[in-house]
Amino acid sequence: PVRALRVNYVGELGWELHHPMGQMELLYDSIYEAGKKENIINFGTYAVNSLRMEKAYRGWGAELTGEISLVEAGMDRFFNLKKKNNFFGAKALQNKIQSGVDIKIVYLEVDVDNADARGNEPVYHNNKIVGVVTSGGYGFRTKKSLAFAYVKSELANGESLEIEIQGQKRKAKILDKVVYDPDNQKLRA
């Protein structure tokens, strides 16, 4: 059995297939054979990263970790603390909201022409380190170098930032919306 979910991690109309691991080779071969007439091709993790960066999709292990709260990660729209019988961790999240957060995620367009932020680069404001890049890459559809970073909360709203990439500080502009298909028209096609 295969469960097909109309969701994906790349911001295009697509499907995730959930199945027993023992079926993967047969399923892959069947889909690849059927897709030949549509010019199906394989693509790898750099392509997936490029696509997810353009949609500002956060990644597990980079933007989303056990040490980062949903509030710090900018995931507020995905939970409701007013519901009865709320989720595990709701009380801790409520406490975090009430006490305030020290860091917040920012989505950045980086002014660079030959190298992109990948993760762990320092983020500067007024020549002081104020955060760290969690991931980044080049958006091939938008022709933009993009990155996520956690910075001090007070700098998360439009401040001028810089990212050190290969020993050079590069300007980074905080984006307030997704750079590719911000209204999710492709996903709703």
Task: Say what each PLM segment does.
Residues P1-A189:
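Conserved, structured C-terminal
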